[in-house]
């Protein structure tokens, strides 16, 4: 038998429900803030960042390298450990890479990289370093820190070994950046100097505290900063305006060793979407591009390779070449006979 509740009974029940609802909302808010999914204001002005989990990687690295559903792929000698992902061990002639499977279509973003480089080698007897990529192609092994040469996109290099002889202008390890449209080669013998956008010294080997690198791309402005002093403070390294990067490229990181070696470890990669205000003029200027470039920096234009000839086209070329050759021979014989006839008439 149902018991009727008076006005005071309904009020008490409604108040209890309201309290439970409010508690649930507060718990949900705390969970979101604790997981990093909520927006966070960064810098001056109306700029907020949102963690994008589909482009981020952190411990415990579940499924990386083993599951087909993982958002990240391993390549080469890269291996998953409990506390980090090792791109290359401290052994000669190794290379490895870690690539995101999801293309990034964000307009403005910030990538925070937590890494560690360490090994047994003494001064200038270690190498070669690691690279962070935002490129059109992924999973393409090659000579540029374990990735393909003539890449299309952005490469940021943490170079630990000076290849150029009599190098006195810069101290290694050295961070540099390069934008490529697929037409440029990375010059190992000169440590990439002919094509670099800028760089700075970064003493990152065999440190006993965490080392971080951040790559920020906002309003076609590329900024690279580092936190390598154990002070939890970002220090400027590279700042380049007018950098045009297409959307839909892939994030990755790679490393390579040669005669010299090091352990190259990645602890985490965290990508944040940055929301920034744009004026109508900026909206017009910041339209999507289809090929990487840098304002006021001339990159060689890509020349499309000629398409291969079809079988019919090749047959026609050979056929008409033979016809032309036969025609030329016949004309030559006729002219020669006429010349001989004229020569006989002169003597008789």
Swiss-Prot record:
- What Gene3D superfamilies is this protein classified in? 2.60.120.200
- Pfam families, per the entry: Lectin_leg-like
Cite the binding residues for a carbohydrate.
93, 128, 161, 163, 188, 258-260
Q: Where does it mainly reside? A: endoplasmic reticulum
Q: Which residues does the annotation flag as glycosylated?
A: 181
Lumenal topological intervals:
39-313
Q: Where in the cell is it found?
A: Endoplasmic reticulum membrane; Golgi apparatus membrane
Which residues take part in binding Ca(2+)? 159, 161, 163, 191
Record GO biological process: endoplasmic reticulum to Golgi vesicle-mediated transport
Provide the membrane-side ranges marked Cytoplasmic in the record.
Answer: 335-348
Cellular component GO terms held in the UniProt record: COPII-coated ER to Golgi transport vesicle; endoplasmic reticulum membrane; endoplasmic reticulum-Golgi intermediate compartment; Golgi membrane
Q: Which GO terms describe its molecular function?
A: D-mannose binding; metal ion binding
Which segment of this protein is annotated as the motif Endoplasmic reticulum retention signal? 344-346
Q: Disulfide bonds, which pairs?
A: 200-237
Q: Where is the L-type lectin-like domain?
A: 49-274
| Record keywords | Disulfide bond, Endoplasmic reticulum, Glycoprotein, Golgi apparatus, Lectin, Membrane, Metal-binding, Signal, Transmembrane, Transmembrane helix
Membrane association type = Single-pass type I membrane protein
Ranges annotated as spanning the membrane: 314-334
Q: What is this protein called?
A: VIP36-like protein
**Which gene holds the coding sequence for this protein?**
LMAN2L
